[in-house]
Amino acid sequence: MLNQQKVVEIYTDGACSGNPGVGGWGAILRWNGHERELYSGEVQTTNNRMELMAAICALKVLKEACSVDLYTDSVYVRNGISLWLERWKMNNWRTTSKKTVKNIELWKALEDVCSLHTIRWHWVKGHAGHPDNERADALARKAITEYRKNGYFSA
């Protein structure tokens, strides 16, 4: 009997007020008629870090190996995981221009959590009316707003 993996759709986004500045990330997970929203942030961060955190944190909540369609508006995340990561590792975490890769610890964390799942990466144009991308963006901005109001991230 074949082992069927749970199929999960994930929509992620990151936002930053100032770059660097207060940032937030949001994610929507959808499977078998269920849905879960996640969001949080960091006080001093960048938009790229928040884009990475959205994918990492969304994948970390999956309790078993899944077949994932992950949608992001971040070319940085999609190209990093799909095109650049293997070359960075072979070059001791250096870019083709010999600079140290930014956010190494997050790239390593993303690679680790990706190894548990079968993931298809999809790029969607940000701020172009895609409903689930807009919702993920709203969650990321909600994290920033809550931090500014309360002085902490609630999620």
Swiss-Prot record:
GO biological process: DNA replication, removal of RNA primer
EC number of this enzyme: 3.1.26.4
Principal subcellular localization: cytoplasm
Record carries keyword Transport: no
Any one GO CC term of the record: cytoplasm
Reaction(s) catalysed by this chain's protein: Endonucleolytic cleavage to 5'-phosphomonoester
Cofactor: Mg(2+)
The keyword Cytoplasm appears for this protein: yes
Main enzyme class: hydrolase
Subcellular localization: Cytoplasm
Domain RNase H type-1: 4-145
Residues the entry annotates as binding Mg(2+) 1: D13, E51, D73
InterPro entries (alphabetical): RNase_H (IPR050092), RNaseH-like_sf (IPR012337), RNaseH_domain (IPR002156), RNaseH_sf (IPR036397), RNaseHI (IPR022892)
Binding sites annotated in the UniProt record for Mg(2+) 2: D13, D137
Record-linked PANTHER family: RIBONUCLEASE H1
Protein's job: Endonuclease that specifically degrades the RNA of RNA-DNA hybrids.
Assembly description: Monomer.
Protein name: Ribonuclease H
